[in-house]
């Protein structure tokens, strides 16, 4: 599959993948495996930004559904993404990959604030930049945060690593006949409500012509294969 030439990418990981085979929290061994994938991608000469969800620790919408105030629950979810970012930073630096965490909620003792020009300098110095705390405001998902940072950092593509190997016309977990798309347009994703990212994230990528590449991060070596245009994936583009 022909992919756009990529020099800088943003990798979005769902928080759930950090659980490994656990039901909750962070599996340090699996985080290390993910860090090895990121290191291998960086060694291909790519500049890499990362955004990690927080669903393995706390999901704001789930808290709101159980009676919490939505804004308060969303802030808790943002803090969960900072914990995940620090876990990934620790794993990457154990592998010798220099990493910086920037949070949209300022917490100077543990990470930097989001400053675009500073992030640019980090990338130019071959560091991985992990953006945490979403967009820093409630009612926005980490998918929207990933799309925003991809646009802000002029990324050539947004790679979404999940537990499924692409975009399907229905849920492959419940429908064995679900069809996987090799490529699909932003418009169809929005019109058919395909489960790629939330609508605002897809629209932001569409408006800034940022391809979204959906693939399974659980398969060892899959990130490198996807970046080489190999393996199973779905590309969302115009």
Swiss-Prot record:
Inhibited by UTP. Its main location: cytoplasm. Gene3D superfamilies: Acetylglutamate kinase-like. ATP binds at residues 12-15, 55, 59, 162, 168, 171. Keywords: ATP-binding, Cytoplasm, Kinase, Nucleotide-binding, Pyrimidine biosynthesis, Transferase. Pathway: Pyrimidine metabolism; CTP biosynthesis via de novo pathway; UDP from UMP (UMPK route): step 1/1. It is found in: Cytoplasm. Its EC number is 2.7.4.22. GO terms for biological process: 'de novo' CTP biosynthetic process; UDP biosynthetic process. InterPro entries: AceGlu_kinase-like_sf (IPR036393), Asp/Glu/Uridylate_kinase (IPR001048), Uridylate_kinase (IPR011817), Uridylate_kinase_bac (IPR015963). UMP binds at residues 54, 74, 135-142. It is an enzyme of class 2 (transferase). It catalyses: UMP + ATP = UDP + ADP. GO terms for cellular component: cytoplasm. One of its GO terms (molecular function) is ATP binding. The keyword Phosphoprotein does not apply. Homohexamer. Catalyzes the reversible phosphorylation of UMP to UDP. Belongs to the UMP kinase family. PANTHER family: URIDYLATE KINASE (PTHR42833), URIDYLATE KINASE PUMPKIN, CHLOROPLASTIC (PTHR42833:SF4). This is Uridylate kinase. It comes from Erythrobacter litoralis (strain HTCC2594). The lineage of its organism: Bacteria, Pseudomonadati, Pseudomonadota, Alphaproteobacteria, Sphingomonadales.
